[in-house]
Amino acid sequence: MSGYIEKYIYGKFALDYWDVPAIRGKIEPPDAIFPEEYVIFTDKPLYRPDRAIIHTCSIRGAEKYVEGPACTLPLVFLQVALDYTIHELIYLGLQICSYREGDRPRCTVEELRICAEELRGHRGRRKALRAIRYLCDNSRSPMESILYMFLRLPNALGGCGFKEIVLNEKIVLEDGGKTYFADLYVPSCKLDIEYDSEEFHSFASALSRDRERAAHLEAEGFRVVSVGYSQLTDLKAFRNLVRQLSRLIGKRVFIRARKFFENFVALRDLLLRKGYSLRSRFRKVHRHEFPWYSGVRAAYKIYLAAWNRLVRHPNLPLVLTRAP
């Protein structure tokens, strides 16, 4: 009788196997090389040769989340959850559930949720469930994912808290039956938020198509707002964008959470750092590093008070946190 136990590709190495897009240069350095890692589903002692990284998993039901030589993405999401910050993990989840033209998606948010809820006791489960709360299917680009995070995440995670936003909603026009997909869509006010990539929207033909598309949508009562990269990188432009969206959606952005400041900076790091480490939670956020929404003045005073307590009493329980 053979004692051979099958091993399966694990963790970040499995992200490469499943070809999850736009990880390097966003949450990993552009030249990152993931080590070969495997998992074996057993609760028995195991010989681990020096040439391979082998993990064991004894959680009942985990063994069904495999396909071919690798763990499936719902299980991989749990395996890597503690390797990333909460913002990086949300971004990863959006990319895992991103749209693939002409093919089924790699994974869906519901599949991630079912796996995380089922595998009680798995490493990273609690953090994964927290991230899954903010995920949405069908992102078509890394910048769509990041724009979605800026607008959808709650204030305590650095976002605007526009909870209705969904990604790539299908819109079928009554007049002529034309079909469009909205990059980000708010159903209650028929608002289409389009991310204009400099790579794909700078040609005359693309600009002409965009204008025609906007005209068709606006003729049937939809409102279209275009967002460029500079509106995300420039704080004043971003504040003006949020004010415009706030008026159209009918939801006021009012900051009460002191964690807004460090987490907004974390989102900016995700946008600008290109896969290199996010700022330390122990580095103070200054006034010029965030947009001045309503409520920011009072909330920033609370943030500074918490920061000063941390500086004076560094050995006491952490009073200023960004989720690890």
Q: What is the role of each PLM region?
A:
Residues E110-P324:
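Surface segments flanking catalytic/ligand-binding clefts of nucleic-acid enzymes
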